[in-house]
């Protein structure tokens, strides 16, 4: 099978998948038990996204080296804006079901359409470094005003409920996502620019903000992503690889003293991480997983649609893989996992030898790992978009399939 034919088949499968996704939601809307008109618009935007990606694929032989990186970073820029909106308007999002999907439409719709126009109009002037600088400075401004918006007071928060109240609903989760994105972008700019001192303040502020917010999922995912990058990037040098493995073992062995030291300065995240390590506290996720297994067993083929999953906490079980199976059923869920997770990791690993790919590689692994403990459907949807663009880029550079 030729590479072009293989591309067409994969993109056709992607469009078929999104078509099923959209059609299923419309059918549910027409026959009752509907999510809402907002959700229908959300699926329609996803379908339009797939069509745009398919049209880009028609010219995949002519795609330039950094077009994927531009697409990816522009979508991530929209993702940062979405997290900021969630952080500011968290109480309104929590009181009105489905309102939060308006921001998802902004992420997918604006991200893809802005990327498309950018590629057509200013592809000669827009590169990953400039986009990272834009994300860095906007993120730096957001981080500076976060304490005033969220009234974040780490000294008076001792449990998850207080943490969520201080973060205004979804605020603490949004803060962590903004902080982690700022950390990754800042490290990327430090690695790839001569004026490294410009990006050190943003890195330090982002680390403080991420720790102060107290949400552990995004932070753990970042640690996993960084070690994954270091291990794979050192695979050709046995001494570097041994050094990374020794550091990883040291972190594992001394994890409790490290967390106790962190607790002195950031009591919320330190306390919650100690609960996770010492008592295996999962904030009730084990109960949600058992419920998810039962629901998947009862309806393994069709699933329950995105907004109709009858979970105790609403529409998700805080596990990206199980969320996908709940929403789509096992057959379509396996296709989503193959494209969004497996192909993403292969694509990211293939780019690890060059430091200019630090941001997209670490961001890819971070989003994948974070979706395993957070809002799986939204993050997996983003992974799916990124993977399609990444596959186009990767195949334009290699004959491997």
Identify the role of each PLM range.
Residues 41-46, 68-83, 92-120, 134, ...:
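Aromatic-anchored transmembrane helix interface
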Residues 84-99, 130, 137-175, 264-272:
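Membrane-interfacial helix-loop-helix modules of multi-pass inner-membrane proteins that assemble, modify
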Residues 129-155, 170-232, 365:
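Alpha-helical transmembrane segments of multi-pass inner-membrane proteins
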Residues 14-18, 184, 359-370, 376-401:
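Transmembrane alpha-helices of multi-pass inner-membrane enzymes
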């Amino acid at each position: 099978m030729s590479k072009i034919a293989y591309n067409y088949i994969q993109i056709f499968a992607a469009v078929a998948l999104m078509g099923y996704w959209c059609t299923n939601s419309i059918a549910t809307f027409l026959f009752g038990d509907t999510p809402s008109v907002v959700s229908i618009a959300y699926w329609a935007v996803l379908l339009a996204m797939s069509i745009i990606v398919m049209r880009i694929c028609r010219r995949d032989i002519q795609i330039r080296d950094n077009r994927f990186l531009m697409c990816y970073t522009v979508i991530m820029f929209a993702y940062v804006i979405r997290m900021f909106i969630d952080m500011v308007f968290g109480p309104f999002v929590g009181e009105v079901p489905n309102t939060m999907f308006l921001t998802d439409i902004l992420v997918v719709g604006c991200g893809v359409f802005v990327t498309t126009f950018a590629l057509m109009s200013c592809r000669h002037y827009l590169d990953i470094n400039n986009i990272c600088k834009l994300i860095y400075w906007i993120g730096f401004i957001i981080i500076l005003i976060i304490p005033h918006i969220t009234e974040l007071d780490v000294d008076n928060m001792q449990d998850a409920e207080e943490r969520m109240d201080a973060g205004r609903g979804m605020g603490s989760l949004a803060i962590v996502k903004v902080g982690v994105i700022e950390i990754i972008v800042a490290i990327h700019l430090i690695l790839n620019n001569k004026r490294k001192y410009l990006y050190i303040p943003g890195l330090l502020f982002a680390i403080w903000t991420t720790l102060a917010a107290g949400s552990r999922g995004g932070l753990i995912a970042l640690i996993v992503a960084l070690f994954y990058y270091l291990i794979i990037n050192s695979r050709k040098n046995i001494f570097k690889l041994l050094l990374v493995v020794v550091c990883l073992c040291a972190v594992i062995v001394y994890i409790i003293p490290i967390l106790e030291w962190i607790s002195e300065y950031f009591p919320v995240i330190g306390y919650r991480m100690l609960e996770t390590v010492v008592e295996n506290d999962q904030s009730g996720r084990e109960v949600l997983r058992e419920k998810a297994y039962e629901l998947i067993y009862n309806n393994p083929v069709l699933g329950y649609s995105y907004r109709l999953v009858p979970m105790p906490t609403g529409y998700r079980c805080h596990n990206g893989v199980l969320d996908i199976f709940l929403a789509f059923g096992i057959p379509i869920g396996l296709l989503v996992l193959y494209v969004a997770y497996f192909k993403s990791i292969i694509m990211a690993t293939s780019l690890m030898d060059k430091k200019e790919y630090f941001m997209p590689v670490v961001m890819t692994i971070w989003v994948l790992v974070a979706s395993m403990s957070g809002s799986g459907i939204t993050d997996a949807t983003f992974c799916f978009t990124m993977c399609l663009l990444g596959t186009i880029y990767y195949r334009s550079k290699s004959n491997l399939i």
